[in-house]
Amino acid sequence: MNIIDEINQEQMQSVLPAFGAGDTVAVHVKVKEGDRERVQIFEGICIARRNRGLHSAFTVRKISNGEGVERVFPSYSPLVTKVEVKRRGDVRRAKLYYLRDLSGKAARIKEKLG
């Protein structure tokens, strides 16, 4: 194992729950406003996972005031304090980019049973 891999392993300490595309997740993020720091919750559907070791990330999409909002979170960022899985989605794709073109009830995802 070379030195870069060792440093990456040290940085990858955060433990995320098992979730994938289609799952509804609530991401707790530290937000700094001036001298104050608070935790903000971003809840939506995970539409993509990117597994690249230390550079892993996941994309969460939600509808806010009728407008679609997507945010990419690095998996091992110290600003991501917690990820909660609200419900499991039953999907057949790894990337759900087609949800960007759908609106309303068409953009719903079936819940995985069992």
Swiss-Prot record:
The lineage of its organism: Bacteria, Pseudomonadati, Pseudomonadota, Acidithiobacillia, Acidithiobacillales. GO terms for molecular function: structural constituent of ribosome. Pfam families: Ribosomal_L19. Coiled coil: none annotated. The keyword Ribonucleoprotein applies. The keyword Flavoprotein does not apply. GO terms for biological process: translation. SUPFAM superfamilies: Translation proteins SH3-like domain (SSF50104). It comes from Acidithiobacillus ferrooxidans (strain ATCC 23270 / DSM 14882 / CIP 104768 / NCIMB 8455). This protein is located at the 30S-50S ribosomal subunit interface and may play a role in the structure and function of the aminoacyl-tRNA binding site. Gene3D superfamilies: 2.30.30.790. This is Large ribosomal subunit protein bL19. GO terms for cellular component: cytosolic large ribosomal subunit. Belongs to the bacterial ribosomal protein bL19 family. Keywords: Ribonucleoprotein, Ribosomal protein. NCBIfam families: rplS_bact. PANTHER family: LARGE RIBOSOMAL SUBUNIT PROTEIN BL19M (PTHR15680:SF9), RIBOSOMAL PROTEIN L19 (PTHR15680). It comes from the Bacteria. HAMAP family: Ribosomal_bL19.
